[in-house]
From Swiss-Prot:
Function, as annotated: The heterodimer acts as both an ATP-dependent DNA helicase and an ATP-dependent, dual-direction single-stranded exonuclease. Recognizes the chi site generating a DNA molecule suitable for the initiation of homologous recombination. The AddB subunit has 5' -> 3' nuclease activity but not helicase activity.
Gene: addB
Positions of the UvrD-like helicase C-terminal domain: 282-588
Cofactor needs: Mg(2+); [4Fe-4S] cluster
Source organism of this protein record: Geobacillus kaustophilus (strain HTA426)
A molecular function GO annotation: metal ion binding
Protein name from the UniProt record: ATP-dependent helicase/deoxyribonuclease subunit B
UniProt miscellaneous comment: Despite having conserved helicase domains, this subunit does not have helicase activity.
The record's free-text note on cofactor binding: Binds 1 [4Fe-4S] cluster.
Any Pfam family: ADDB_N
């Protein structure tokens, strides 16, 4: 029995010596005693490959490559330690969560933290660390007691509580596992116990390679190997034997020197012979003298510069991380294409994997570079995992919309042999219905049929259901049954389950009934056929992982009774931890490795990525349960734990050294100057060190395209087709802006255009360079097919065209509309207000009452009755769907009651009486439509509904006025009237005046147009108001109507008989002077002004109608001051209007004063 050290700096050939010795022994005696090559887990695949391809080996039985865990399985299979059930990390974490829930009252700190994301994982890591460093729960308790009883210092009490809680959970976990289960750390303990009984390892030759340090559990295993194996050879990356003592903490080889000393002491304490160390001094790896110089001089002070020029060390400075990875990808393509490199000769070494993971995937896909990322990928994005999560969430949240459709959108609820495209379309339609009707809870699970009506709210009163609606309703219920039935069965089984086994059985039956294995197999076959080999394997892994998770739950917690919500929490915690296992799908691929973790063999070209300050060297990160200060306090008590942040800082130069010297031919070190958000990043001190060491090393400046990197030749950007196409388009864009480009790009363009697989894609991309965001006018026949030969239009439609012709086309030509959502929107509130006022007016007419006769209690009673009758007709009874909406309904009653009271006050003060409410005009309306013959002969009819028409008798004849109810403040802006943006009120006035004889039996004069704001304002006063008359004025003032009145004193007094000379009217926007004339600040217009406005509006209608008939659909939104047509437009995703695009500009309208508008109309000038 002996211990032999094989020592040498990186690249000295330690691994090669091991492989050569193994080869020689295999050739001498193929069936001799076992040879075990023990390496880190992440190195096993590469070592097996290297060993099997060692010249003269071929196949082998005697030698095997193991990690510590795989060796444990091999020994326990032989000696009988595998009878206990193996629990993965996922199972352990589920058990920990259960323990915390059960012992929450006894925990001092952890009870409150259990539900925080990542806490269970951190606690598991802490317990794992305790096991690796041979700390028992009892020892943790003793240390907790020591801190509790010791001097009162900051943090000691907190540390005592932490240790106490860890000990409690740790002890309970061990009690649950002992005798029945094994977790990953138990294998190492059992391996140490079972090595003496293993005939396989007795007198074996052990080679330990690739390790720089060991945990106490691993030292226990090595101790047993030393006792029972013929020879243990340990390879360490170190410059010399440290028999004479430890080097300084800042020494480059401090970490492996520490390991060397501990192994030596272990052998001496067991009376194991220590052979003379073999120290390899020659550099056998590096082919270039510059890399030999780097290996020898790294971390030496003072630095010895390498005087000669070199092509073996390159520095890349990139504008951002994407430019950095694209530059690396271009160089990889060049190496493979021009220098004959294989992808497997190349490695990317990254410390910040989270910052680069997605970038590497995206860029390497574009460049067609095969790669293997040495990092396990979480499963949470897989459809099966999402289905399980969403299905359980559906049950516990009472069928919330989000949970149900997360399950639906996995595609796994669809019938196995169904048409995927058809079912996705059906799911979209079902989702639209669920959103519009507010479907949740019992509406999914009861047997009540879902009803469908195309017409919403008050529009659909007394309209029978059409055949089209009935047909869609039938399909809707079929889709509902097909998709919801499996979830309903799952819910019934989960509700009936009495323990963990019942819950898991319900979930398994749910997946089995959906034929998930068959569906995943189909998905896997499709992925494999498309060449997506990694994805193909992931489908099978996902199914096995979910089944294994349920098995582990049943095994450990199957007999436990617990609430369904708690079961779901535990399963979700398990799902969070599921990861895809890593097996390289091909041999020739770039290795993407982590700087601190990966072990690389036979790499010729290495790219050290992201060499920024704070990354290399690394900052101390405290992301575990134990803070660095607490680890120091434990270390003072002699407690050994994993290296803390301070120790890791000492070790960091060693890992950086390993990364820099791993390539045999060329080293590239890259760093970005900004992150993804544009924040500046500083280069690592390593960059300064390398530039001093290699003053003649080339430094490359890398941008996102050829213009950003003028030093690079154009040929460097011609790589894989997908990436080259991107660069080509950027060059052509520059050419279009009159910049010069390299002639090579025209050759690239011609090559693409002549290639059958790429020409259409490139043509499409090039056409985008000349794209102008405009809309081609419709041909006459298409315009007629869309709008009809006789156009029937509302006034708001005419306004919409004036705001933006394309918005009109999208709304009335394409008939696009927003997805209806089950909530109360502003238009619904406005609709309710209108309907309530009309119902109150109808009730008064039925009871032969007048508005003037209403008292405040009458207003409140009538308003409450009206709102109660109308509410069920608004948005699928949304106002009865929740307590929140019930409260809103009460508030709406108050608004209507306040409005009704104000209207009654207006009636008492006014000589005008309503003669029409919701007065319709059109072919079948109360009044005929307003008809126009357009220039091309097309007839256009204006149709609509007027909120309220009032009449008064004056000395000059009958006066008519229009009142429009608005749920938001509104005034009549003559600038908007002039430009055709606000045509409604004057059009309504024109209609009632045009058809006055039909309406009132004689011609009439315009009294004005007014907006009445329906609201419930808070009255503000600077001091307490006791006077009732004054208070009445304060209450009426916020309801003063806005608009435009006839400039006639008699008409104004008819509108407000209470107005006093010199005072503003509380009802209309007018004031009479003390002399009885109209004040200049009043909003009034003469009869001739009204006539000019009416004529102007009519001319606008003819112009707008003519443009509609001619097929005008231009993207031309208006801009008036700070108002634009795009502000509240729902069609922006369709038109994609963008001022940055060529041809996209606002149609800017100049503001006009009231006087200027009147003057222009009088002169006959049009807007």
């Amino acid at each position: 029995m002996s211990l032999r050290f094989l020592l040498g700096r990186s690249g000295s050939g330690k691994t090669a010596v091991c492989l050569e010795e193994i080869r020689r022994q295999l050739q001498e005696d193929p069936k001799g005693r076992a040879i075990v090559y023990l390496v880190p887990e992440q190195m096993t695949f590469q070592c097996e490959y290297a060993l099997i391809h060692t010249e003269g080996v071929g196949g082998m039985i005697r030698a095997q490559v193991f990690s510590f865990t795989r060796l444990a399985w091999r020994v326990l299979q032989e000696t009988g330690g595998m009878t206990r059930y193996h629990i993965h990390d996922v199972g352990v974490q589920m058990m920990i969560r259960k323990i915390i829930e059960q012992r929450k009252q006894e925990l001092k700190l952890f009870g409150r933290a259990a539900d925080k994301h990542g806490f269970i994982e951190q606690l598991n890591e802490m317990i794992t660390e305790c096991k690796r460093y041979c700390l028992t729960p009892g020892e943790l308790r003793r240390h907790a007691k020591a801190f509790e009883d010791g001097p009162d210092q900051p943090g000691r009490r907190l540390l005592a509580d932490k240790l106490s809680d860890v000990a409690l959970v740790y002890e309970e976990l061990e009690r649950s596992l002992i005798g029945h289960y094994l977790d990953s750390e138990d294998y190492l303990r059992l391996l140490a116990e079972h090595i003496p009984r293993s005939s396989y390892l007795r007198d074996a030759d052990i080679y330990i390679d690739g390790f720089h340090h060991f945990a106490p559990q691993e030292y226990m295993i090595i101790e047993q190997l030393l006792r029972h194996c013929r020879r243990v050879t340990v390879c360490l990356t170190i410059d010399r034997p440290y028999d004479d003592g430890m080097p300084d903490e800042l020494h480059l080889f401090y970490l492996p020197a520490q390991t060397y000393r501990q192994l030596r002491e272990l052998a001496l304490s067991n009376d194991i012979a220590i052979e003379e160390p073999i120290v390899l001094s020659a550099n056998r790896r590096h082919e270039d003298r510059a890399l030999v110089h780097l290996e020898a001089q790294f971390h030496r002070r003072p630095l010895l510069p390498y005087g000669a020029k070199t092509d073996a060390v390159h520095l890349y400075e990139a504008s951002n991380r994407r430019a950095e990875i694209e530059a690396v990808a271009r160089e990889i393509i060049r190496l493979v294409r021009d220098e004959g490199a294989r992808y497997r000769d190349i490695a990317l070494i990254i410390r910040q994997t989270e910052a680069y993971r997605d970038l590497v995937k995206t860029v390497f896909f574009d460049f067609g570079i095969p790669y293997f990322m040495d990092e396990k990928e979480p499963m949470h994005h897989h459809p099966l995992i999402e289905l399980v999560r969403a299905a359980l969430e559906t049950v516990v949240t009472r069928w919330r919309y989000e949970a149900v459709f997360r399950a639906v959108k996995t595609d796994l609820l669809f019938p196995t042999d169904g048409d995927l495209h058809m079912w996705r379309e059906a799911a979209d339609k079902l989702e639209n219905y669920v959103l519009a009707y507010g479907i949740k809870g019992d509406k999914w699970t009861n047997n009540e049929r879902w009803a469908y009506r195309r017409y919403q709210a008050l529009d659909g009163l007394n309209v029978p259901q059409t055949d089209e609606e009935r047909q869609f309703e039938d399909m809707l219920n079929e889709w509902r049954e097909a998709l919801a039935a499996p979830l309903r069965r799952l819910e019934r089984r989960l509700r009936r389950a009495e323990d963990g086994r019942g819950f898991c059985m319900a979930l398994y039956l749910f997946l089995e009934e959906l034929q998930i294995p068959k569906k995943l197999e189909k998905m896997s076959a499709q992925a494999e056929a498309d060449g997506r080999l990694v994805e193909a394997r992931q489908h099978e892994q996902a199914w096995n992982a979910v089944v294994d998770l349920l098995d582990q739950y049943v095994e450990m917690l199957g007999t436990e009774s617990l609430p369904l919500a708690e079961f779901v929490k535990i399963i979700e915690a398990g799902l969070d931890r599921l990861e895809f296992s890593l097996v390289p799908p091909a041999m020739d691929q770039v290795i993407v490795a982590q700087l601190d973790r990966s072990r690389l063999i036979d790499i010729k070209y290495a790219f050290v990525i992201g060499a920024n300050d704070g990354v290399i060297p690394a900052k101390v990160k405290e992301d575990g349960l134990m803070a660095e200060v607490e680890r120091e306090q434990l270390r003072e008590l002699g407690v050994a734990l994993a290296p803390g942040g301070r120790e890791q800082l000492f070790y960091d130069p060693f890992f950086v050294y390993l990364a820099l010297v791993c390539p045999s031919r060329r080293l590239y070190v890259t760093y970005p100057l900004a992150d993804g958000e544009g924040k500046a990043l500083m280069p690592s001190p390593l960059i300064k060190q390398l530039t001093e060491l290699f003053p003649h090393a080339p430094v490359h400046l890398c941008g996102n395209d050829p213009f950003d990197a003028p030093a690079e030749k154009a040929e460097a950007f011609v790589t894989a087709p997908r990436a080259t196409q991107t660069y080509l388009i950027s060059q052509l864009r520059a050419w279009k802006r009159n910049y010069g480009i390299d002639p090579l790009w025209w050759d690239v363009y011609n090559t693409f255009i002549g290639h059958r697989d790429w020409k259409e894609q490139v043509r499409h991309a090039v056409s985008a360079l000349f794209y102008t965001n405009g809309a081609t006018p419709l041909k006459k026949q298409w315009s007629q097919r869309l709008y009809g030969k006789k156009i029937q239009a509302s006034v708001s439609r005419m306004e919409q065209f004036q705001k933006c012709p394309y918005a009109h086309f999208a709304s009335h030509g394409l008939r696009l509309k927003e997805r209806n959502v089950f909530r109360l929107e502003a238009p619904d509130v406005g609709q309710l207000f209108h309907a309530a006022i009309k119902q109150i007016a109808d009730r008064l007419r039925e009871q032969h009452l007048d508005w003037r006769e209403l008292s405040r209690p009458d207003c409140e009673r009538l308003s409450a009755e009206a709102v109660e009758r109308i509410a069920p007709l608004i948005q699928q009874q949304v106002l009865s769907s929740s307590h929140r909406y019930e409260y809103m309904k009460r508030k709406l009653k108050h608004v209507v009651a306040r409005t009704t009271h104000v209207l009654s006050e207006h009636a008492r003060a006014s000589g005008f009486v309503p003669i029409g409410l919701e007065l319709s005009f059109g072919p079948n309306g109360d009044l005929p439509p307003l008809r126009f013959r357009l220039p091309d002969g097309t007839v256009m009819e204006l149709v609509g509904r007027i909120d309220r028409v009032d009449k008064a008798e004056s000395s000059q004849g009958v006066l008519l006025r229009i009142i429009d109810y608005k749920s938001s403040a509104k005034t009549l802006d003559l600038t908007e009237v002039y430009y055709g943006l606000a045509l409604q009120m004057l059009t309504y006035l024109d209609i009632v005046l045009t058809y006055a004889e039909q309406l009132v039996g004689q011609p009439a004069l315009p009294a004005g147009v007014l907006y009445f704001h329906i609201h419930n304002p808070i009255v503000q006063a600077k001091q307490w108001v006791d006077d009732e008359v004054e208070m009445a004025k304060k209450l009426l003032e916020p309801f003063r109507m806005r608009g435009l009145l006839l400039a006639d004193v008699e008409a104004i007094r008819l509108m407000d008989g209470r107005t006093e000379d010199g005072q503003w009217s509380l009802i209309v926007p007018a004031q009479l002077t003390k002399s009885g004339s109209i004040h200049s600040r009043s909003s009034v217009a003469s009869p001739s002004d009204f006539a000019a406005l009416r004529q102007h509006v009519r001319r606008l209608f003819i112009d707008i109608g003519g443009q509609i008939a001619d097929g005008v659909v231009s993207i031309a939104p208006y801009k008036l001051k700070d108002k634009t047509a795009c502000e509240f437009c729902v069609f922006k995703p369709v038109c994609q209007f963008d001022e940055a695009l060529s041809g996209n500009e606002y149609r800017k309208l100049a503001p006009q004063t009231k006087e200027a508008v009147i003057e222009k109309l009088a002169e006959g000038k049009e807007g």
